[in-house]
Amino acid sequence: MPWLNACIIMELTLITLKIRHQTTYRYREPVALGSHRLMLRPRESRELRLISSEVTVTPAAPITWAYDVAGNALATVAFQTMADTLVIDARAELQLDAAAYPVFDIAASAIVYPFKYSADEWTDLGALTVQQYPDPDGRLLAWARAFVRGDQTDTLALLKDLSTGVAQTLQYQTRETEGTQSPIESLDRGWGSCRDFAVLFVEAARGLGFGARLVTGYLYIPAESRDAMRGADATHAWAEIFVPGAGWITFDPTNRGVGGSNLIPVAVARDIRQAVPVAGSFVGLTDAFESMEVEVLVTS
């Protein structure tokens, strides 16, 4: 029975992971590097203990750290020299201690959908309940409502069905280019990257009245599961939905996952465009940019 969730003992999996995330930019000639913003430090929590974290840049430059409005660690790099190659190297070691099969202690008032957030919850969730992409014809909302089973729908089952629906609707394709498709573009094209999966899920959930946020970070895939999961050797994106009692529940629509036993969050955001790992500029000729390479390695 749902209200007995708190009495169920969950099996926790403790694992130590090492992350290396290296981004290399190459230019055809030396350019003046502008300020760069980096979101590369994993978010510490009850389930994630950060042992060490280091970010280095070549050419060397001062790095200052701060926290943004969502509590994400934000590094700003002020380059003072010209260069034809820029290397940003982030390394971290951490312990992840999360239930492989989590049980959520959802408040009695929220077990059945639709439910109402408290006045304080609604105020604090604020913009996280507002869709960020236009849906002028109501196509996305109609798509999302198709997962509602009636006037009395189990809330967690609805969210699981919605996540599965994203995975069934979109074909997964890796995409190195920047940017994210709108939910309508994803529905029209029928394919997308993990970012597109997460955005479609979050926007659909917001349309149904949920508070939702995007999460970016890394995905750990054990060797025996690499053929069954998508998103290895790259940054990853997923979602969190706020449900009273349970708090923020993690959903990975790319892999039809619930819970964060193999997810390492770096940033949470209202809009996926607020959680770009590396953002910056340079001054030089328009054709000076040559290439970008990203290498991500998550090992136990």
Predicted segments, located by residue:
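Intrinsically disordered, low-complexity N-terminal segments that are enriched in acidic
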Residues: M10-F115
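Glycine-rich, small/acidic residue-mixed loop/short-helix segments
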Residues: L38-L48, V55-T56, N255-F289, V296-S300
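Glycine-centered loop/turn motifs
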Residues: R91, D151-Q152, A228
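Secondary-structure boundary elements
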Residues: S109-G192, L200, L208, R270-I272, ...
